[in-house]
Amino acid sequence: MLEKLVTSLETCPMVQRNGYNYFIHPISDGVPIVEPELLREIGCAMVKMLDLDKVDKIVVAEAMGIHIGTVLSLMTGIPMNIVRKREYKLPGEVAVHQTTGYSKGELYLNGLFAGDRVVIIDDVISTGGTARALLSALGQIGVDVVDICVVIQRGNPDIGRDYKSLTKIEVNERVHVIDKHC
């Protein structure tokens, strides 16, 4: 299982910015092209890995969690909530400050309420900044985060709780898949 994901990671292009090796991958960057078979494989793996019977909503961060969350929502019938990078000024909107390995900014939560049971889905975890910010904000609202799952784990970021990943990678001159969890 996960053959398409592993192959696509191990053959993806690399670029270097400010001494940091970035891998360019359809799941994390949306380029060069996002193949439906890859999305289907990821969705099937997440459905197997997660206990979604206890989940009311799928929460994804804009932008690269959206396609993964959409696949999971279509496969399960669970509604998806997108944490946006733009403020809408809706009643109850919560601003979240996010710091990742490559950016800082605000994210905005809408449509999430105390007692909601959610799973957080994202493309990559490397520093854990997005996950920590979401966990903090969701906790303040009273949302129960049932689980967290990412497609690609780079390193071992500590986010203050357990999370699941489909693959774990090391990045040197190229991507090496060192573990797959499905």
Curated annotation (Swiss-Prot):
<comment type="pathway">
    <text>Purine metabolism; IMP biosynthesis via salvage pathway; IMP from hypoxanthine: step 1/1.</text>
</comment>
<dbReference type="GO" id="GO:0005737">
    <property type="term" value="C:cytoplasm"/>
</dbReference>
<comment type="function">
    <text>Catalyzes a salvage reaction resulting in the formation of IMP that is energically less costly than de novo synthesis.</text>
</comment>
<keyword id="KW-0963">Cytoplasm</keyword>
<dbReference type="GO" id="GO:0052657">
    <property type="term" value="F:guanine phosphoribosyltransferase activity"/>
</dbReference>
<comment type="similarity">
    <text>Belongs to the purine/pyrimidine phosphoribosyltransferase family. Archaeal HPRT subfamily.</text>
</comment>
<dbReference type="InterPro" id="IPR000836">
    <property type="entry name" value="PRibTrfase_dom"/>
</dbReference>
<keyword id="KW-0660">Purine salvage</keyword>
<dbReference type="GO" id="GO:0004422">
    <property type="term" value="F:hypoxanthine phosphoribosyltransferase activity"/>
</dbReference>
<comment type="subunit">
    <text>Homodimer.</text>
</comment>
<keyword id="KW-0808">Transferase</keyword>
<dbReference type="InterPro" id="IPR026597">
    <property type="entry name" value="HGPRTase-like"/>
</dbReference>
<dbReference type="InterPro" id="IPR050118">
    <property type="entry name" value="Pur/Pyrimidine_PRTase"/>
</dbReference>
<protein>
    <recommendedName>
        <fullName>Hypoxanthine/guanine phosphoribosyltransferase</fullName>
        <ecNumber>2.4.2.8</ecNumber>
    </recommendedName>
</protein>
<dbReference type="GO" id="GO:0032264">
    <property type="term" value="P:IMP salvage"/>
</dbReference>
<dbReference type="GO" id="GO:0006166">
    <property type="term" value="P:purine ribonucleoside salvage"/>
</dbReference>
<keyword id="KW-0328">Glycosyltransferase</keyword>
<dbReference type="InterPro" id="IPR029057">
    <property type="entry name" value="PRTase-like"/>
</dbReference>
<dbReference type="Pfam" id="PF00156">
    <property type="entry name" value="Pribosyltran"/>
</dbReference>
